[in-house]
Amino acid sequence: MSRPTVLAAAEGKKDWHVLRTSREAVRLFIADMVHAVRCVPEALAEVRGSLHPLRAKQALETVFAELLLMAAFGLYLLLRLPAAADLYFSIMMPAAIFVLIAFALFVQSCGGDVTFGLIVSTLIVLGIVLQLMLTAYAAYAGATSPRRFLVIHCVSLITGLLALLFFRCVLRMRAVHAAVFLSLLTAACYLILFVFGSAPAGTNARAWLCIGPLSLQLTEIAKVLAAAAMALVISDTDRSGKARLLRSFAILAANGVFLAALGELGTLLVLTLVYACLLFVFCPDRTELRRATLLKMFGAVAVILVCVAVFSAVCLRASNGAKVAVIREVRTAAPAVDGDTRTIDEKIAAACARDKEAAKTCAPLINRVGNEVWKVCRRVLAMKKPEGLTDEQMLALGVDNYQLRRNNMAAASGGWFGSSYEMDRYTMVVAESDFVFAFVLRALGGVGGIAVLLMTLALLICGNRRLGAVAGRAEMAVGYAFLYALVGQMLICIAANIGLLPTVGLPMAFLSRGNANSVISYLLVLFILYAGRRPQKEVSR
């Protein structure tokens, strides 16, 4: 037999072997999916079995704590906006009892982190309060339906429990098969948006699927599926470190292509942050984050933050010293020097001109960092003037985005403790969703904004503490992915609302209004709480 004939026969055998291997892989994948479907009753029984009955005293303490939380926020509304308080007590509070008490009892029954659950309950009530306070705006009067908002919370809690059961079944598959299955569902969401997706007026992101009066932001669902797929791949111990790294990056890159085509760069930013955090946790071969490692990590972060703060102060002084001095003078209403007849706008324009001159003598990095730090300083300095900045002054300071400009003007007028007068002086844009943190600064002031930021960081710390001790590696990985997606999106939304990042159009968990956002928020926290549950023996102690 000639050599070409032998080579042709060998190639044919190789092709047949590849085809047979592919068929076998597909068959195993389908068999794994069928097994996961058949395990639904078993997974449901497992979830029910992990919920232990509560003692009467424990249940009463839980109910009393939730009622006290809602009463405290109701009293705050009664003092600030009596009209909104009437809606709160007559419509929102009765149904919120069913949502909050059911959620709190689930946390206690499954042995979840009580602190984590209490923070989530506070965010839920705060979201209800903010949506009701929006009714004080003439532009939002009638736009926020309390009954509809309440129904969304009830349905979202039930849907979140069903989604928790879905992921419990998916985790019964092999890690690689589960990742492929979730990736296929993610691709299906993107294809549906390409064919049937729509974009709100004034945006280019085709992220919504409208079915009659109902609209769903499918990219929120795709984000969760993609994050879980990356977590399963990157935590798969059956693969080498290089293979896990490349496959997880391939999932991120594929999602990046779809999201860029849809115009959803904010969701891509969240997934990138989740990917980076998962790499930090799982690329070293360790099954959990030990407390010592976690303390070292926070210590390193603290040192880095101190260095960044010092460097930022130097950059701010070098690149924006003139602007800071003049704006501080404007905000404190300092008396003008004799013979100084310049207006406020002229002073700001002169400060900006001196800032540009200083930039010519600074290194590009120093000037860039100084301008970013200035965005934060502008917010702090503006708090000293109750009516905030005018539209012309915001333009003079370089804020040319209309939505960000209007919302920053309104946020600056909130001061440190919020302001309820002249609610229509600044027409806020998308304050119920994407710019809800700007409305927090407007209605609750800087203190309220700091409280929301601290609660977000507390979610990260509590979640890390519990998830680091989870026995199942796949469950721990998905829990970490959900935690970083939840907290990461909240931090990105906060940064975008105060001008540290470009406008990304992302909602905040529990504070923003939205169908898909509400469902996904409940799913994320329920999965994190259930994954970090303690055994019944530990709970009963």
Please state what every model-predicted region is.
Residues 398-447:
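Long extracytoplasmic/lumenal interhelical loops at the membrane interface
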Residues 427-431, 439-442, 482-486, 510-514:
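Transmembrane helix-bundle signature of multi-pass membrane transporters/permeases
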